[in-house]
Amino acid sequence: MNQLIISAATEGAAEANPLVPNVWEMGVVLVGFAVLMYIVVKFVVPMFEKTFAERAEAIEGGIAKAEAAQAEASAALEEYKQQLTDARAEANRIREEARAEGAQILADLKAKAAAESARITEQAHAAIESERQAAVVSLRSEVGTLATTLAGRIVGEALTDDQRAARVVDRFLADLETQSAGAAK
């Protein structure tokens, strides 16, 4: 049997090289490859191209949408910043108006209080002066009566004459006023 294997190997070795393929096999493989390439180029590649184009378009559309959204967000941010700046300026203006109005109200109240104080003081001075005049008149009549009575006792005669009594009282009061004026100086 060993002989048989060796002889078969020597016969086949002379006829074909295992590294060089058979021509018919190579032709069949090339025809199969050509058919496969035709199918791939005709059907598969266009589907891949279509899918690739759709995905590229979707990606570019997504990028465009993202850029548009980013631009819109930036515009909204700028608008909000402007509104915030305007609101702060408005708040400052309102605060300054309120401060000025408060100062005006305070000044008005101070002026009213000063006027009221002056009026009350003037009324008090008038009331005091009125009471002083009433007191002076009352005191003159009482002092006159007392002076007449006292003078009558001192002199020893009654001063029943009204004119004489009035002169005595007036002279007494004039002396009293000059003494009080001299003491006040």
Curated annotation (Swiss-Prot):
Spans traversing the lipid bilayer: 28-48
One Pfam family matching this protein: ATP-synt_B
InterPro entries noted in UniProt: ATP_synth_B-like_membr_sf (IPR028987), ATP_synth_b/b'su_bac/chlpt (IPR002146), ATP_synth_F0_bsu_bac (IPR005864), ATP_synthase_B_chain (IPR050059)
Keywords from the named record: ATP synthesis, Cell membrane, CF(0), Hydrogen ion transport, Ion transport, Membrane, Transmembrane, Transmembrane helix, Transport
Membrane topology: Single-pass membrane protein
Predominant place of localization: membrane
GO cellular component, one term: proton-transporting ATP synthase complex
Nucleus found in the keyword field: no
SUPFAM superfamilies, sorted: F1F0 ATP synthase subunit B, membrane domain
Similarity-based family: Belongs to the ATPase B chain family.
Binding partners and assembly: F-type ATPases have 2 components, F(1) - the catalytic core - and F(0) - the membrane proton channel. F(1) has five subunits: alpha(3), beta(3), gamma(1), delta(1), epsilon(1). F(0) has three main subunits: a(1), b(2) and c(10-14). The alpha and beta chains form an alternating ring which encloses part of the gamma chain. F(1) is attached to F(0) by a central stalk formed by the gamma and epsilon chains, while a peripheral stalk is formed by the delta and b chains.
NCBIfam families in alphabetical order: ATP_synt_b, PRK05759.1-3
Role: F(1)F(0) ATP synthase produces ATP from ADP in the presence of a proton or sodium gradient. F-type ATPases consist of two structural domains, F(1) containing the extramembraneous catalytic core and F(0) containing the membrane proton channel, linked together by a central stalk and a peripheral stalk. During catalysis, ATP synthesis in the catalytic domain of F(1) is coupled via a rotary mechanism of the central stalk subunits to proton translocation.
The protein's name in its UniProt record: ATP synthase subunit b
Source species of the chain: Paenarthrobacter aurescens (strain TC1)
